[in-house]
């Protein structure tokens, strides 16, 4: 067997394997003889059908089967011979079985990039720090109060703190636009949930009244097509309702599963810490890996990007179904996820290379600690979580990879130039 590797553009490779034609002929003869011993043909006893007759009837299928068997039997050795490791299953691109002396096939594939990781000491990374203040805790408690706040309709003019029920329609140049209309829309005055001027225009209005507001969308509005546009809102006031806040007592605390207010405040603080730790961890990890990715430029296998994009599309569809959502109108192409897929694949290759270079491995103790961290964050039974992962090799591997990923982060932070930026709880939640 002779194997020759052609280096194409980027990570693309083409491998041609040459074999004696006798190997192909012997393989086809063997398959033909097997078929001849099994098939029934008119005019012939079973098992007595001439091979020539079988070849005429099944020749193309036999050749295809023979080629597949030869490729399966020889490809691994051929790849070893040329020292190539495909990223995914090689694809047959050419077959030559007509030559009198040789049979050859060509497969195309991508290889993994050769990665020489950049010096960590050259990286500059910003990490976020957040301190939870008493004011943050009070805001969270106020949010719980709002959940249990009741509203009673009144016949007076509206004030800050009142909840209004309105119908509205927005017009730009006399025409409506997406999201411009709503019926029985609830808005609490003073929350700042609408564009500037909207809530202000609803102060001192009475039930069953109508008004028009001429406003301008902010230049940094999240919908670009509306940014900076002048808009007229036609508004009907259906109801003005006075808030009745709940008392902060034992009854209030029990509605949130705690015995009293002291226990509720402790629970709030713990939940805020879990939330902020998760958010900071996510942002700081991204900052580390963004710096790592920027410092290491190399080709990323397109086949891996395509596979990851398909995975991301599948995850999105599953999330929509789990949340009770309806399928999107029209199929979303996997290519819509290419940028994120490329990022994930590249970082996966970098983490793997760093792990290999530094001989990193996750101990059982580290894996169990990570499982406990996950179970505590989700408020679930720790032992059940650990048992479920230990019984599923795929799940256990995912935890092992998370542990190694964290080890890589720590390794980078230990050597990089790291700066810290203090932020407020509200800024990152």
From Swiss-Prot:
Q: Which residues form the PPIase FKBP-type domain?
A: 161-246
Superkingdom field: Bacteria
**What Enzyme Commission number(s) appear in the record?**
5.2.1.8
Supply the name of the protein.
Answer: Trigger factor
Reactions catalysed, semicolon-separated, are: [protein]-peptidylproline (omega=180) = [protein]-peptidylproline (omega=0)
Q: Which HAMAP family match?
A: Trigger_factor_Tig
Q: Which organism is it from?
A: Ruthia magnifica subsp. Calyptogena magnifica
What job does the chain carry out?
Involved in protein export. Acts as a chaperone by maintaining the newly synthesized protein in an open conformation. Functions as a peptidyl-prolyl cis-trans isomerase.
Query: NCBIfam families, from UniProt?
Result: tig
Cell membrane recorded as keyword: no
* Keyword annotations of the record: Cell cycle, Cell division, Chaperone, Cytoplasm, Isomerase, Rotamase
Q: Name the gene behind this protein.
A: tig
Entry's free-text remark on domains: Consists of 3 domains; the N-terminus binds the ribosome, the middle domain has PPIase activity, while the C-terminus has intrinsic chaperone activity on its own.
GO MF terms on file?
peptidyl-prolyl cis-trans isomerase activity; protein folding chaperone; ribosome binding
């Amino acid at each position: 067997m002779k194997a020759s590797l052609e280096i194409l553009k980027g990570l693309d490779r083409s491998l041609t394997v040459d074999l004696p034609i006798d190997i192909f002929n012997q393989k086809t003869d063997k398959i033909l003889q097997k078929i001849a011993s099994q098939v029934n043909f008119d005019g012939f006893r079973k098992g007595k059908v001439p091979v020539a007759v079988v070849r005429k009837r099944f020749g193309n299928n036999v050749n295809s089967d023979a080629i597949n068997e030869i490729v399966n039997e020889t490809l691994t050795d051929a790849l070893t011979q040329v020292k190539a490791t495909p990223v995914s299953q090689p694809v047959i691109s050419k077959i030559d079985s007509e030559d009198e002396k040789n049979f050859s096939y060509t497969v195309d594939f991508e290889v993994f990039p050769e990665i020489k990781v950049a010096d960590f000491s050259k990286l500059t990374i910003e990490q976020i720090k957040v301190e939870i203040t008493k004011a943050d805790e009070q805001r969270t408690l106020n949010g719980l109060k709002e959940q249990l706040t009741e509203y009673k309709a009144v016949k007076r003019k509206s004030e800050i703190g009142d909840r209004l029920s309105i119908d509205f329609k927005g017009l730009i140049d006399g025409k409506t636009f997406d999201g411009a209309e709503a019926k029985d829309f609830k808005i609490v005055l003073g929350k700042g949930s609408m564009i500037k001027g909207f809530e202000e225009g609803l102060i001192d209005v009475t039930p069953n009244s109508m008004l028009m507001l001429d406003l301008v969308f902010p230049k940094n509005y999240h919908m670009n097509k509306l940014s900076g546009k002048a808009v007229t809102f036609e508004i009907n006031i259906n109801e003005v309702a006075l808030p009745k806040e709940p008392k902060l007592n034992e009854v209030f605390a029990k509605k949130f599963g705690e015995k009293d207010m002291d226990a509720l405040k402790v629970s709030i603080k713990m939940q805020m810490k879990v939330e902020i730790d998760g958010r900071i961890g996510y942002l700081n990890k991204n900052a580390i890996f963004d710096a790592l990715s920027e410092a290491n430029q190399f080709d990323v296998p397109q086949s891996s990007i395509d596979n990851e994009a398909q995975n991301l599309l599948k995850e999105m569809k599953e999330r929509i179904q789990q949340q009770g959502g309806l399928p999107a109108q029209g199929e979303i192409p996997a290519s819509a996820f290419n940028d994120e897929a490329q990022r994930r694949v590249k970082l996966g290759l970098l983490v793997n290379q760093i792990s290999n270079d530094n001989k990193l491995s996750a101990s059982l103790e580290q894996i169990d600690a990570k499982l406990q961290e996950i179970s505590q964050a989700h408020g679930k039974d720790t032992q059940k979580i650990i048992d479920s992962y230990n019984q599923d090799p795929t799940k256990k591997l995912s935890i092992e990879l998370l542990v190694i990923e964290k080890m890589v982060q720590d390794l980078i932070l230990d050597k990089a130039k790291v700066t810290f930026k203090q932020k407020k709880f509200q800024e990152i939640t």
